[in-house]
C-alpha cells in the first residue's frame, strides 16, 4: 500500500510539473504573438499616416 501511495504521489507531482511548464510556454507564446500584433498595428498606423500626408501622384489641372 505504501508503494502505491508513493507512485500515485509521484505521478500527480510529475503531472502538475508538466502542466505548469505547458502553461508557461503558452503564456510566452501569447506574449510573443501580442507583441508581433502590436508591432504590425503600429506599422500599419504609420503607413496609413504616410498615405494621408502624401499628395496623390497626379494633380488635376
Swiss-Prot record:
Location within or outside the cell: Secreted
Pfam families: FSAP_sig_propep (PF03032)
GO cellular component, one term: extracellular region
Taxonomic lineage from the root: Eukaryota, Metazoa, Chordata, Craniata, Vertebrata
Function recorded in the entry: The synthetic peptide inhibits bradykinin-induced relaxation of rat tail artery smooth muscle, and also has anti-proliferative effects on the human prostate cancer cell lines LNCaP, PC3 and DU145.
Annotated tissue distribution: Expressed by the skin glands.
Ranges of Basic and acidic residues composition bias in the record: 36-55
Listed name of the protein: Tryptophyllin-1
Signal peptide as annotated in the record: 1-22
GO biological process, one term: defense response
Domain of life of the native organism: Eukaryota
Stated family: Belongs to the frog skin active peptide (FSAP) family. Tryptophillin subfamily.
Main location: secreted
UniProt keyword annotation of Isomerase present: no
Region feature Disordered, mapped onto this chain: 24-61
Keyword Secreted among UniProt keywords: yes
Keywords, alphabetical: Amphibian defense peptide, Secreted, Signal
InterPro entries: Frog_antimicrobial_propeptide (IPR004275)
Amino acid at each position: 500500500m505504501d508503494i502505491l501511495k508513493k507512485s500515485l504521489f509521484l505521478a500527480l507531482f510529475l503531472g502538475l510539473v508538466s502542466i505548469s511548464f505547458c502553461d508557461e510556454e503558452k503564456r510566452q507564446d501569447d506574449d510573443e504573438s501580442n507583441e508581433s500584433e502590436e508591432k504590425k498595428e503600429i506599422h500599419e498606423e504609420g503607413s496609413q499616416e504616410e498615405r494621408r500626408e502624401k499628395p496623390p501622384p497626379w494633380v488635376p489641372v
